[in-house]
Design a protein with these regions (language model features):
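Structured beta-strand/loop patches that form or line metal/cofactor-binding pockets in enzymes
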Residues: 1-39, 324-330
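Conserved, mostly hydrophobic/aromatic
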Residues: 29, 54, 103, 116, ...
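N-terminal small/glycine-rich loop or linker at the start of catalytic domains
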Residues: 118-140, 178, 185-189
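Catalytic core of soluble alpha/beta enzymes
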Residues: 165-298, 334
């Protein structure tokens, strides 16, 4: 779905929004459904993998056996072209893990509906509301500091706890000025986390973190470039007065293990819609707890709300309050979770607790 405006972060531009709706039908009459993901380049391949490979693999299985079904998908012999899966083919591996994630999330929704409880209760039920922050501060054409300040005040009016603010597209000095002026406007009780989207060298990231220390920044997210994730993150972590976040691009618990042990991150923001679904995410959360690492989640509030509510070391659920940035969040669910006093409240209905708008699905369906 093409967006009305262009939204730019430290290293990218967003011009469209996509998602994948997955449904599982059981002989008990339960329909497990979930939506997530935003990969326009590979989404059709993900759909084909689910239909052509996972569907015949899973039909007839007990939907309650989520761990067994996850392993069955992960260890199956998948043919995604002219290469085998277990070679250095990151694109195909990513397709596999996103396909597993789509099926796995729908399975958990079915499981919650079967047992008549919300998914977060199945996962541990640590709290019934999670603090919520907006994703904003994008670089947009013609958008000056006044408009940026107004955007942040609008988030406060929406009762957001704070914002994840984009940095990294201009100089460190310019970004510090942007953040400092926003801090003046929103006050000290409004959370500001900064997201560089892998824009900086370690030295630039360290310079930003040191300069931003007086501004009470909750964390710096993905500060270094993709090819320097482990050593670069370690360097920033050791010299930054601000907690360091990474993990949204990792697709398995094994990559997250390396970020924790070698990258020494303070927080993991793994995306369950990319990294194998709920089953894999909860294993990553368990790993993180052993190292006193907190858990965040990259976007996708419809599933992250349940995950973060189920553990003691979960942080903020993230949403795009601007319908121009994420029209799917506003149009696809029939009703969205309530936001009140800086928190998003958990649904009380079984499963993931979000019914989908069939008219929207029909209008934008691509496959």
């Amino acid at each position: 779905r093409e967006l009305e405006d262009v939204f730019s972060g430290g290293t990218y531009r967003i011009v469209n929004r996509n998602t994948l709706v997955t449904r599982i039908y059981t002989d008990a009459g339960i329909i497990g459904e979930a939506f997530g993901g935003d990969e326009d380049q590979t989404q059709m391949e993900i759909v084909s993998l689910i239909r052509d490979h996972f569907e015949p693999l899973l039909v007839g299985e007990d939907a309650r056996n989520v761990e067994r079904l996850w392993d069955k998908m992960f260890f199956s012999n998948v043919d995604l072209g002219n290469r085998a899966l277990h070679v250095l083919d990151l694109r195909n591996r990513s397709i596999l893990m996103q396909a597993i994630a789509a099926v796995d999330m729908a399975l958990w929704d079915a499981l919650g509906k079967y047992y008549q409880v919300p998914v977060y209760k199945l996962l541990g039920g640590y709290r019934d509301r999670v603090p919520v922050i907006a994703i904003g501060g994008y670089y947009e054409a013609g958008k000056g500091q006044d408009a940026l300040n107004e955007e942040m005040l609008y988030y406060k009016e929406l009762q957001m706890a704070g914002v994840k603010f984009k940095v990294g597209r201009v100089s460190v000095a310019e970004d510090i000025e942007r953040v400092a002026r926003v801090r003046e406007v929103v006050g000290d009780d409004f959370v500001i986390a900064c997201d560089a989207n892998q824009a900086w060298t370690p030295q630039e990231a360290i310079a930003f973190c040191r300069a931003a220390e007086p501004l009470n920044i909750r964390w710096i997210e993905e500060p270094v470039r993709w090819y320097d994730q482990l050593e670069g993150l370690r360097m920033v972590r050791e010299q930054s007065p601000i907690p360091v976040v990474a993990g949204q691009g990792e697709i398995s618990r094994f990559g997250c293990r390396d970020l924790v042990i070698h990258g020494q991150v303070n927080i993991l923001n793994v995306d369950a819609t990319i990294a194998g679904g709920i089953t894999e995410w909860r294993k990553i959360a368990g790993l993180a707890a052993h190292f006193h690492v907190e858990m965040a989640h990259h976007e996708e509030a419809q599933v992250s709300l349940h995950l973060l509510a189920a553990i003691p070391h979960g942080l903020y659920v993230e949403i795009f309050p601007n319908p121009k940035r994420d029209p799917m969040w506003f149009d696809l669910p029939v009703a969205r979770p309530t936001i009140r006093d800086g928190f998003m409240e958990l649904p009380t209905t079984p499963g993931l607790g979000i019914d989908l708008n069939e008219d929207v699905i029909a209008k934008y369906r691509a496959a």
